[in-house]
UniProtKB/Swiss-Prot annotation:
Repeat (MORN) residue spans along the chain: 15-37, 39-60, 61-82, 83-105, 106-128, 129-151, 282-304, 305-327
Cytoplasmic side: 1-606
Species, as recorded: Mus musculus (Mouse)
Highest taxon of source: Eukaryota
Name used for this protein in its record: Junctophilin-4
Record flagged with keyword Endoplasmic reticulum: yes
Topology class, membrane: Peripheral membrane protein; Single-pass type IV membrane protein
Compartment(s): Cell membrane; Endoplasmic reticulum membrane
Compositionally biased region (Pro residues): 170-179
SMART domains associated with the record: MORN
Length: 628
């Protein structure tokens, strides 16, 4: 495991956890300034890799990271929504599922944090949109399917007729009827999600209050009449304000003859009702999250519009087919027919319409092509949504691993924190920078400076000792009596086999101890017995060749002046490399008589003095015998 460490940032943040090569590595916990935000989990060379980030507002991210950004699979949770899926460059993408607490859900493709490509959006009331998206909005071709009217959510915004997360509520009862003269909003005001078709002859509330000149100089739908309408109420479609209008007033702007309209007060017409089980489907083009372009909207009761759209309204050339089979076609403006009219007789209409009919036919043909394209995009969107659901499942699995990594990181941080804060007791580090367990004291078997016993063995002198300092075996090599003090080294019984331990050299060691007990360590050789010197565990010897000159102990002449006999001394011929217990191989070599040297004061050998005294006594005895 990587060694632990702690790093305090200048802004008040702090990191506690694994540390390697001067960077966060392994498990660790990092907090922001003032504990605002926290990441806990795995780190890789200074960057987050797998873990959990918790923001100051309570939102969290669990998943993969790369180069300090969210990358791979992960789950983001906020107070009102959750995203599960892929991440790219710190943003949502490429595939994932977004869900809101209200029930809204999007499954599909993402780009730069927004819905982009193909996807399926399911609304809180159960309605759906399947098709193309761009920069988080419905854009391209798609299909919007509503739920039954009594289940559809009531829209708040007067501009939104397609439900989304920011402008949706669970289905609620219809709003109270407006007061007479109350200005109606757009066609979507008070409408249900997914329902945009207007009833027969309905016109936009705002535009219907404009004065329109008619034949005979009368003002249909004047402001005065708008304020005094007795039947001022919203139509059952919920998209426009109902009014008292005659059959003729529904054909405002038509190409019919001037005398075809009544000049008296308008006759109220019963509003059309929408069944609670009615549904509505739109298939076609979308622009900036609204129905715009060519498309077809059809209600389950038979009401149908084919043609051009703009901002969720019928705008341009198109055709409306009513449930009873009758049709009206022409040019629409903000849901209001301004050129054209009802189709009563095909022959008179064909003579009057001219170019309007041609434009309507082109618009209807374009709307039908748009429906075909929208259905194809719908299938692609469904496939992308299925892939996104699989990515969401994989992201949830990664999130579980991230939570486990965060738990491990917090445990390690808790273990490291007391040790890092304790004064005077920090973890040891080896030469490579890795931490080791702190030791209260060194083990007695550990040698100083990192030397092993074989490396720390003292070397024998490379030259003979001078007369002022006679050579003697090093103390660490001399055999000691049983129970003796071995100094900084352990007993020979604990040495391993390669050092000549007791397993192989027990007999030789016993021989040394026996000689020590018998007092063999005399000051010099006696009766030609070899002198055992220090032995080295190296492969060399003190002398490799015979006949090499070597200084010996000073010799004294007898009073008669005769030269002394050659002295036989042992010379080391070879050394065993098995260890300090191994014996030395010796060979007796005859050495030439040493040259005379003046006796050094204080350097006489007691044996020599005794021999001289014995010689004097012998000479005295001989002289006494001769005299007698």
């Amino acid at each position: 495991m990587s060694p632990g460490g702690k790093f305090d940032f200048d802004d008040g943040g702090c990191y506690v956890g694994g540390w390697e090569a001067g960077r966060a590595h392994g498990y660790g916990v990092c907090t922001g300034p003032g504990a605002q935000g926290e990441y806990s989990g795995c780190w890789a060379h200074g960057f987050e890799s797998l873990g959990v980030f918790t923001g100051p507002g309570g939102h969290s991210y669990q998943g993969h990271w790369q180069q300090g950004k969210r990358e791979g699979l992960g789950v983001e949770r906020k107070s009102r929504w959750t995203y599960r899926g892929e991440w790219l460059g710190g943003l949502k993408g490429r595939s994932g599922v977004w869900e809101s607490v209200s029930g809204l859900r999007y499954a599909g493709l993402w780009k730069d944090g927004f819905q982009d490509g193909y996807g399926t959006e399911t609304y809180s009331d159960g309605g759906t949109y399947q098709g193309q998206w761009q920069a988080g909005k419905r854009h391209g071709y798609g299909v919007r399917q509503s739920v039954p009217y009594h289940q559809a959510a009531l829209l708040r915004s007067p501009r939104r007729t397609s439900l989304d997360s920011g402008h949706s509520d669970p289905p609620t009862p219809p709003p109270p009827l407006p007061l007479p003269g109350d200005e109606g909003g757009s066609p979507a005001s008070g409408s249900r999600g997914g329902f945009v078709l207007a009833g027969p002859g309905d016109a936009d509330g705002a535009s219907s209050r404009k004065r329109t000149p008619a034949a005979g100089g009368f003002f249909r739908r004047s402001l005065l009449l708008s304020g005094l309408r007795a039947g001022g109420r919203r139509s059952s479609l919920g998209s426009k304000r109902g009014s008292l209008r005659s059959e003729v007033s529904s054909e405002v702007g038509s190409t019919g003859p001037p005398g075809s309209e009544a000049s008296g007060p308008p006759i109220p017409a019963p509003p059309a009702l929408i069944e609670g089980s009615a549904t509505e489907v739109y298939a076609g083009e979308w622009r900036a999250d609204r129905r715009s372009g060519y498309g077809v909207s059809q209600r389950s009761n038979g009401l149908r519009y084919e043609g051009e759209w703009l901002g969720n309204r019928r705008h341009g050339y198109g055709r409306t087919t009513r449930p009873d089979g009758s049709r009206e076609e022409g040019k629409y403006k903000r849901n209001r027919l301004v050129h054209g009219g009802r189709v009563r007789s095909l022959l008179p209409l064909a003579l009057r319409r001219g170019k309007v009919k041609e434009k309507v036919d082109r618009a209807v043909e374009g709307a039908r092509r748009a429906v075909s394209a929208a259905r194809q995009r719908q299938e692609i969107a469904a496939a992308r949504a299925a892939d996104a659901l699989l990515k969401a499942v994989a992201a949830s699995s990664v999130a579980e691993k991230a939570v486990e990594a965060a738990r491990m990181a917090k445990l390690i941080a808790q273990d490291l924190q007391p040790m890092l804060e304790a004064p005077g007791r920090r973890p040891r580090q080896d030469s490579g920078g890795s931490d080791t367990e702190p030791l209260d004291e060194d083990s007695p078997g550990v040698y100083e400076n990192g030397l092993t016993p074989s490396e720390g063995s003292p070397e024998l002198p490379s030259s003979p000792a001078s007369s002022h300092q006679p050579w003697r075996a090093p103390a660490c090599r001399s055999p000691l009596p049983p129970g003796g003090n071995w100094g900084p080294f352990s007993s020979p019984k604990a040495w391993p086999e390669e050092w000549g331990g007791p397993g192989e050299q027990a007999e030789e060691l016993a021989g040394y101890e026996a000689e020590d007990e018998a007092g063999v360590q005399g000051p010099g050789p006696r009766d030609g017995s070899p002198l055992l010197g220090g032995c080295s565990d190296s492969s060399g010897s003190l002398r490799e060749e015979e006949g090499e000159d070597e200084e010996s102990l000073p010799q004294l002449r007898a009073p008669g002046g005769s030269e002394s006999e050659p002295v036989t001394t042992p010379v080391l011929r070879g050394l065993s490399s098995r260890g300090p217990d191994a014996g030395c191989l010796t060979e007796e070599v005859e050495e030439p008589a040493p040259t005379e040297r003046p006796a050094q004061p204080g350097a006489a050998n007691p044996l020599v003095v005794g021999a001289v005294a014995l010689l004097d006594l012998s000479l005295a005895f001989l002289f006494s015998q001769l005299l007698t």
